[in-house]
A protein has these predicted regions:
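Glycine-rich cofactor-pocket loops
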Residues: 157-179, 285-300, 331-340, 364-379
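A conserved active-site cap/scaffold subdomain adjacent to cofactor or substrate pockets
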Residues: 247-282, 286-287, 291-348
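A structural signal for small-residue-enriched, beta-sheet-centric alpha/beta enzyme cores
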Residues: 121, 216-220, 240-247, 373, ...
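Alpha-helical transition-metal enzyme core signature, strongest for iron centers
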Residues: 37, 88-92, 145-152, 182-196, ...
Length: 452
């Protein structure tokens, strides 16, 4: 057995490996170790910039050599650290020993004890994890979400003038435009994307219990709060939580996962609507030679992309829900439950990324069946009742709603002929009758909202 997709337990690394491999640099074990190395190195460099008395003579020409330790971090480096962890039984301590080994090779033995100086492992984890989370979302997740939004907008524009029967409670309702119905989803996604982007990527950096005890006892003259704010906010590009226990309180992380979950929920809504439109024959799907829809029924062309997307989004949301509910809770100054949970953050993001790609594929295969849409609209003349009774209200006609209810709320089919016959029975002017007869399901569409 090896690490090949065929033997992976999780489908995100197995069946869907080709769709998720871009996330490995951020959310794999290798990725986490590399980000820990990055934080340790940049922290050491920040100490030389103060400079601490013992680091005043640190050779400036070695700064970039230190950065190369994470820039050129290899799988062999990660394996060395994992092997060391077998002895230490502590993942962050193994990273510290790796860096000391590398610094020794660079001839920097004098400065070894300022690696991980004054820190606890959570100062590294609670900066490395949000940094990996931020960069993975910025680099992989958001561009894919933008692709989904762009595709919806493309179809929204293409189909902006297509009249369509709306359905509320599954029943025929006032007509709408297909493009506008897609705009609903696009607008919702854009709003939730803005909410997501506004959530800070928070980090904890303050020593064993958040008080800078070790830093302060060694160098009480240094403003460690100001130093740490600059290091976390400016050097790492994160948002330092000011007052903490041993760990980040994860309140912003919970907000982030909730925002990611809302985006997925909107896409589930879209997937289900498109699936339903396909079942109603509003859409055909582009055929691909060689593909099979059913092992038993040769005719089947199933909306599998939207089903795949919906399934993956549901799994992702279950995990996001646990992350946002669990992470802000930790016993006293810290328990270890956050550690194992944080290791799973890449999993719901991976399922989301798989879903985005499936939705994109499905949207790209849609072929509009205008004939079916038009036929259903024409078969539902009852929907013009709202328009007729509203115009009659305008004219002061007595009980127009009740009059139209008598026409339409029956088991008899309402047609253009029956509507026009009803209009002819009304005691109104010929001009008003003519106005009412011009109202049709295909033109009773309200305001054009696409492009507004």
């Amino acid at each position: 057995m090896n690490n090949a997709p065929l033997t992976a337990i999780s489908p995100v690394d197995g069946r869907y490996h080709s769709k998720t491999k871009a996330l490995q640099a951020y959310y794999s074990e290798y990725g986490l170790i590399r980000y820990r190395v990055l934080v340790e190195v940049e922290y050491f460099i920040a100490l030389t910039a103060i400079p601490l008395p013992s680091l005043k003579d640190f050779p400036a020409d070695q700064i970039e050599a230190l950065r190369d330790l994470y820039r050129n971090f290899s799988e062999d480096d990660a394996l060395w650290i994992k092997e060391t962890e077998k002895t230490t039984n502590h993942d962050v301590k193994a990273v510290e020993y790796f860096l000391k080994e590398k610094m020794t090779a660079l001839g920097l033995e004098r400065y070894l004890e300022f690696i991980h100086f004054g820190l606890t492992s959570q100062d590294i984890n609670n900066t490395a994890v949000p940094l990996s989370l931020k960069e993975g979302i910025d680099t992989v997740y958001l561009p894919l979400l933008d692709d989904v939004i762009a595709k919806i907008k493309e179809l929204e524009t293409e189909w902006k003038d297509v009249p369509m029967l709306a359905r509320t409670h599954g029943q025929a309702a006032s007509p709408t435009r297909l493009g506008k119905e897609l705009k609903v989803f696009r607008e919702r996604l854009e709003l939730q994307k803005a909410t997501l982007i506004a959530v800070p990527f928070s980090a904890k950096f303050g020593g064993a219990t958040g008080n800078f005890n070790a830093h302060f006892v060694a160098y009480p003259e240094i403003d460690w709060v100001n130093f740490s704010n600059h290091f976390v906010n400016e050097t790492l590009g994160l948002h330092r939580s000011q007052t903490t226990t041993q760990i980040e309180h994860y309140d912003h992380a919970a907000g982030l996962f909730d925002a990611l979950k809302r985006i997925n929920t909107i896409l589930i809504d879209l997937d289900r609507d498109i699936w339903t439109y396909v079942s109603m024959d509003y859409f055909k799907q582009k055929l691909k030679a060689g593909e099979i829809g059913s092992s038993a029924m040769p005719h089947k062309v199933n909306p599998i992309d939207f089903e795949n997307s919906e399934g993956n989004l549901g799994i992702a949301n279950a995990l996001y829900e646990h992350l946002s509910a669990k992470l802000p809770i930790s016993r006293l100054q810290r328990d270890l439950t956050d550690s194992t949970v944080l290791r799973t953050i890449g999993v719901p993001i991976a399922h989301s990324v798989i879903a985005f790609q499936s939705s994109l594929k499905g949207l790209g295969k849609l072929v509009l069946n205008e004939a079916a849409i038009s036929t259903e609209l024409e078969n539902n003349w009852a929907v013009v009742a709202e328009a007729i009774q509203t115009v009659l209200r305008r004219e002061g006609f007595e009980k127009p709603y009740e009059a139209l209810k008598g026409l339409t709320r029956t088991h008899d089919k309402v047609t253009k002929t029956s509507v026009h016959a009803f209009i002819d029975t009304l005691e109104i002017t010929p001009t008003l009758k003519e106005e009412l007869k011009k109202i049709e399901p295909s033109t009773y569409l309200g305001i054009q909202l696409v492009g507004k």
